Amino acid sequence: MSVKNAMTADFLRSAYGGESMAHMRYLIWGEEAENSNYPNIGRLFKAIAYSEHIHAKNHFNVLKEDLYDSSVVAGAVFGSTNLIDNLQGAINGELHEIKQMYPVYLETARYQEEKEAERTFHYALEAEKIHAKLFQDAQDSAKENKDINIGKVYICPVCGFTTLDENIEQCPICGVKKDKFQAF
């Protein structure tokens, strides 16, 4: 695949960088949560890290025929303090993607008729809405010195859709059957 428009290509690189960093940040914060006796919050971080990996991979694959050196600028929370603050950093990052980043990227791709970029931005935007809610629920529990009470976390391997619903039959974003989902 190749992208014809420089602005959409820049947005794909930026989104790739942001999702890549979120992936690593959530893995680190997940380990810290587990080490602080919050195994379910740790598992939630790791599951959502997998979703962010899928988003980064999707963005990358739209540009994979455009191989050249490029700076990737992506602003994000860096570091780690405590569980509550880490969850707030995750919430803030997800809300930035939902309210600012992906709506602009999606509309630009749509305007520039970049169908593959439009698809990957749509997938990420819809999944991030769920991530923000799950992180908020986790933070609410952590503020009460409790781990979040959740069963398995299911991630769609195509779009990164995230759900706690074990009875879901297929992804509501991309249509993939649940038997393909990764469970955490």
From Swiss-Prot:
Regulation of protein activity: Rubredoxin (Rd) increases the NADH consumption rate by serving as an intermediary electron-transfer shuttle between NROR and Rbr2.
EC category: oxidoreductase
Domain Ferritin-like diiron, chain residue ranges per copy: 2-146
Documented EC number(s): 1.11.1.1
Binding site for Fe(3+) 2: 52, 94, 128, 131
Co-factor(s): Fe(3+)
Keywords from the UniProt entry: Electron transport, Iron, Metal-binding, NAD, Oxidoreductase, Peroxidase, Transport
Catalytic activity: H2O2 + NADH + H(+) = NAD(+) + 2 H2O
Gene3D superfamilies: 1.20.1260.10, 2.20.28.10
Residues noted as binding Fe(3+) 1 in the record, renumbered to the chain: 19, 52, 97, 128
Domain Rubredoxin-like: start-end pairs: 151-184
Domain of life: Bacteria
PROSITE patterns hit by this protein: FERRITIN_LIKE, RUBREDOXIN_LIKE
Molecular function in Gene Ontology: iron ion binding; NADH peroxidase activity
Signal peptide as annotated in the record: none
UniProt binding sites for Fe(3+) 3: 156, 159, 171, 174
Induction (free text): Various environmental stress conditions, e.g. oxidative stress (exposure to H(2)O(2)) and other stress factors such as salt, increased pH, high concentration of solvents or cold shock, do not lead to increased transcript levels of this gene. However, PubMed:15336429 shows that rbr2 is slightly up-regulated after exposure to air, but PubMed:19648241 shows it does not respond to the presence of O(2). Is not repressed by PerR.
Primary role: Functions as the terminal component of an NADH peroxidase (NADH:H(2)O(2) oxidoreductase) when using NADH:rubredoxin oxidoreductase (NROR) as the electron transport intermediary from NADH to Rbr2.
PANTHER family, alphabetized: RUBRERYTHRIN
Protein name per the record: Rubrerythrin-2
Organism: Clostridium acetobutylicum (strain ATCC 824 / DSM 792 / JCM 1419 / IAM 19013 / LMG 5710 / NBRC 13948 / NRRL B-527 / VKM B-1787 / 2291 / W)
Organism lineage: Bacteria, Bacillati, Bacillota, Clostridia, Eubacteriales
Gene coding for it: rbr2
